[in-house]
């Protein structure tokens, strides 16, 4: 592959896709993203690429955007953008919010393709094994053609990556009688980046288990009773249990 040409593919024959998205962590903890547009070589009228950072507290490096135009071809079983031209100055990257952008590419002629590169950075210390999620989409006018989801795993240098293998069990009890209470709804939020893990409801035994957690600190709030915040620090892989007491009605 000539110096400066970007390639995508591997041992299996590459498929023709309207849009792909991949991400890679760099040693400085930034994430480099690559979006390929129109490997399928179609004509796409009024084309637009949108992008959303699904993981909270990740920011775009706004001066890192590069846009290349050329023709996607398969060489040595890989996609390569041939005859590429840097057309960054011809397009405006617009940011409706800090967690999304879009680029209006206009009409893409048959056989034309684009490669969009940019960086993003976390605004907090990532945990080893943590996954950062990002979604790119290709549109033609108001019609979405395809989504591409990039899930990029952060691995700490020299460290292990246990990942999302932790869980915690909540047990809601009546403060007076000690009996288990069903139907209590708890919202679990990760303290490090403010990501809402989800809302969880206790079953007939008054218990609910929250799975797939990182080893980290979380805030647990009962949302259907105006309950107080509870802090939970996940320290070990075994299921931990918090007993939560409530005054009877």
Predicted regions and their residues:
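Solvent-exposed loop/turn and edge beta-strand elements of beta-rich ligand-binding domains
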Residues: 1-249
